């Protein structure tokens, strides 16, 4: 069964040790999304979507270093269904075709992408898209060479190159801050 620690489930499957998001953290995240939607049923959908997008990106960035791709897909599907039920409740007399035209679009091979059109204060028409956790790339932790130490002068170049590479690769999706400070 493994154990849960800081929202992660650490478990051995056969000969492999896999770290995944724990079921309790997934449930609490989806519950927070449900509550956000319930609270914001009367707010404009664009504002609600941008609030949900911030939560999705933050949650996915936290779990992006572990085995989480299938979990991200399942979370995206659950959020989509929660939002779909919300708009059906919000517009009970409208047809499915009307709902599709107003709240969904397609881009490339992706269909049924949830959107919320809005107008800015300057009169510009814009669209907010529902972000998907599955779009955030999984990045594994790069292991440090076991004999390397940042306090030894002969390894300074190694840690400089590593810091530059990591700061580029490990930057959190959706933020401007680097994920790794220079050593």
Predicted segments, located by residue:
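Non-catalytic terminal/accessory segments
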Residues: 1-183
